[in-house]
Amino acid sequence: MRIRVPATTANLGPGFDSCGLALTLYLTLDIGEKADSWYIEHNIGGGIPHDETNVIIETALNLAPNLTPHHLVMTCDIPPARGLGSSSAAVVAGIELANTLAELNLSKEEKVRIAAEIEGHPDNVAPAVLGNWVVGAKLDGEDFYVRHLFPDCALIAFIPKAELLTSESRGVLPETLPFKEAVKASSIANVMIAAILRNDMTLAGEMMERDLWHEKYRSKLVPHLTQIREVAKNNGAYAACLSGAGPTVLVFAPRDVADTLQTSLQTLEIDADVLLLDVEGSGAEVFR
């Protein structure tokens, strides 16, 4: 059996801790034979555990403590600590592992709820489970969210080789915002969401680059954001914004400029991968 969970990008600029979009990069988990103890073979390195302290197995055992150990093989295209939802993908993979082996018959809504409890908010986990674009909120311990089709466009991910921990990126954010600035920030997010619902990526893109919640504070940790926005604008893109907490920058563009834009971004003197992606529409899947 195989479990596949997509990468996700959160925020899309002003949709801070609320908007998320599934992307065509994947964490794939192959479930092998039963074993005396849990072992997860993977291609990540970097101190990621191979035993039951691995997030995937830990999550599964929290849901189903009596699971029989198996040999697992994980292949992950989602680089860690880059703002592409690697931790959310691991959590969702663990939920799917427990659901599959213990035959829990969890609904998608239950999977989102469990994952959001673990991660703290639904912005990455909801699109990882459901696919496509999700707008959500966690209020008094309850999750509220709406899934909708994202407008057709090209997505170009500029993924620096250097990591940026979410904890570090959150550390530069202020504890509070002045009321007038918060109202303005909220109105920007509202217009962005309305524009996406209307398939107006030109207006949505303008709002994406006017975020007041987090990007101006995080830009000091991601100095390449300004360069990428300039290249994106010069090549006809709709917008470029931080993916999650960064350092990845996601560029939204018409499909007919995607190849040229990708080539232009590859010429920047920054050690990075530049990938042409799509919106992932299915979310987490199990192949039997």
Swiss-Prot record:
Its EC number is 2.7.1.39. Pfam families: GHMP_kinases_C (PF08544), GHMP_kinases_N (PF00288). It is found in: Cytoplasm. One of its GO terms (biological process) is threonine biosynthetic process. Pathway: Amino-acid biosynthesis; L-threonine biosynthesis; L-threonine from L-aspartate: step 4/5. ATP binds at P79, P80, A81, R82, G83, L84, G85, S86, S87, S88, A89. GO terms for cellular component: cytoplasm. It comes from the Bacteria. It catalyses: L-homoserine + ATP = O-phospho-L-homoserine + ADP + H(+). GO terms for molecular function: ATP binding; homoserine kinase activity. Keywords: Amino-acid biosynthesis, ATP-binding, Cytoplasm, Kinase, Nucleotide-binding, Threonine biosynthesis, Transferase. It is an enzyme of class 2 (transferase). Catalyzes the ATP-dependent phosphorylation of L-homoserine to L-homoserine phosphate. Belongs to the GHMP kinase family. Homoserine kinase subfamily. HAMAP family: Homoser_kinase. NCBIfam families: thrB (TIGR00191). This is Homoserine kinase. The gene is thrB.
